[in-house]
Amino acid sequence: MPPKRRHHGAGRVQNKRGKVDTVKEEIKPKDEPVETEIDGGSAVDEDVTDDLEHKTSKEDQKEDQKEEDGPIDAQNGTSETKVAGESVKTVEDKIESVTTNEEVVESPVNDYNASSTTTKAEEKQLEEEANEKTDTSPIVENEVVDEEAGTTKFDFDGQEYSYKDRPSVIEEKEGKIEFRVVNNDNSKENMMVLTGLKNIFQKQLPKMPKEYIARLVYDRSHLSMAVVRKPLTVVGGITYRPFDKREFAEIVFCAISSTEQVRGYGAHLMNHLKDYVRATSPIKYFLTYADNYAIGYFKKQGFTKEITLDKNVWMGYIKDYEGGTLMQCSMLPRIRYLDAAKILLLQEAAIRRKIRSISQSHIVRPGLKQFLDLDNIKPIDPMTIPGLKEAGWTPEMDELAQRPKRGPHYAAMQNLLTELQNHAAAWPFLQPVNKEEVPDYYEFIKEPMDLSSMEMKLNGNRYEKMENFIYDARLIFNNCRAYNGENTSYFKYANRLEKFFNSKVKEIPEYSHLVD
């Protein structure tokens, strides 16, 4: 085995979208034979015919019993995966030929209706809940849907509320796209959809081994939800593995084609998946490993780094990805996620109604007469201003309000830090160096620094001047170059990130002299 390189920063190389790059191969139970892989390197994927079928054998039947057999046995692993996107030594050197005399597994997805509109009963229930402990008048009046603009408006207590649908929602309503749940059931159309998903995952996750992606997408213990543009063009999807008895599912791959992004497909796809899973299974939680580029997406979809699910439930059952961040989503049982925009507006409307019942903040009073003559403005007692006393205002509040919450350079520092964190060369510097991985690092580097520590200091108002902020940024670059040799990738990453940082500082005239 080659010696480990010294490095600055925890983790391994990650890809830019979706999942992390480096895989620890899933290990099988003792009584389970090694499963065969499907070749993911073939380029002739669009001409899928009836002879493209996945294996079904006694090995598959044992694979399906994994959940009942117990956690993964770490002593029986027979495959090896190299780190950071290097070549993968798979279990078998030659892919098995696909058999055709197999028993067809019935798909569990046929009964799913991916409609994005609520029933009248659901709407009525939502209205009753939002109207609880208030008057019994209808919560929504004069609802108007503008299909051309993709907006919906309604009146509530005389106030107009509106929300705009994502382009993906509009396309679904117009019948241009659909969301299909598919698995490897030997049907020609489902195999074509799965192959389209495989191609997207392999393209969007370039550091992930192609044969590994193919094996999991075609694996019958996994399901996939695909975004399909009619007639049959796959533009993205999610592959996941359900553990019904343990009430959670593992999201294995999630990606949208690079040509179809920024249209809301990712968020709409996740909402469809949540509603489908809750409607067809006892699953209440999602778990997934996300790289640094995917964490933001998953946070927006309700995922968190705080894992509340008991380790005994999932440990040993999900695939472990080196360098990834484990995230969890707890699904709400009484929410239909496809209607989240309307539900949030209804909640806002109900809260505003409650506020109006106990406050006068909605009352608009006339302006002060003292300002009619701008040439002769006289001081006034604030307590004589109509409504101010009723709102609970005191002079002490004014003193607190006038204190600056942030330093004068905070906004510029925050923008610079965000730019640094999002740069492609920043991944080794996002977190402190792991002492267990690099034992002698803190003996050699006496003043360590990383981007997450800078973020904590910035949020704690510990940077009084821009010079202090730049000093810490320089610490990151100098520490890396001091510890790593010139020929290492980390040394080069530090140079790239420093050059980018200097260019960004120079774009701000009042600070440009600090990097000359």
Swiss-Prot record:
The active site is at E250 (proton donor/acceptor). GO terms for biological process: positive regulation of transcription by RNA polymerase II. One of its GO terms (cellular component) is histone acetyltransferase complex. Residues 34-50 have a biased composition (Acidic residues). Residues 1-17 have a biased composition (Basic residues). SMART domains: BROMO (SM00297). Residues 1-136 are annotated as: Disordered. It holds the Pfam family Acetyltransf_1. Acetyl-CoA binds at C254, A255, I256, Q261, V262, R263, G264, Y265, G266, A267, Y293, A294, I295, G296. It is found in: Nucleus. Residues 97-110 have a biased composition (Low complexity). One of its GO terms (molecular function) is peptide crotonyltransferase activity. Keywords: Activator, Acyltransferase, Bromodomain, Chromatin regulator, Nucleus, Transcription, Transcription regulation, Transferase. Histone acetyltransferase that acetylates histone H2B to form H2BK11ac and H2BK16ac, histone H3 to form H3K14ac, with a lower preference histone H4 to form H4K8ac and H4K16ac, and contributes to H2A.Z acetylation. Acetylation of histones gives a specific tag for epigenetic transcription activation. In addition to histone acetyltransferase, can use different acyl-CoA substrates, such as (2E)-butenoyl-CoA (crotonyl-CoA) and is able to mediate histone crotonylation. This is Histone acetyltransferase GCN5. It comes from Kluyveromyces lactis (strain ATCC 8585 / CBS 2359 / DSM 70799 / NBRC 1267 / NRRL Y-1140 / WM37). The lineage of its organism: Eukaryota, Fungi, Dikarya, Ascomycota, Saccharomycotina.
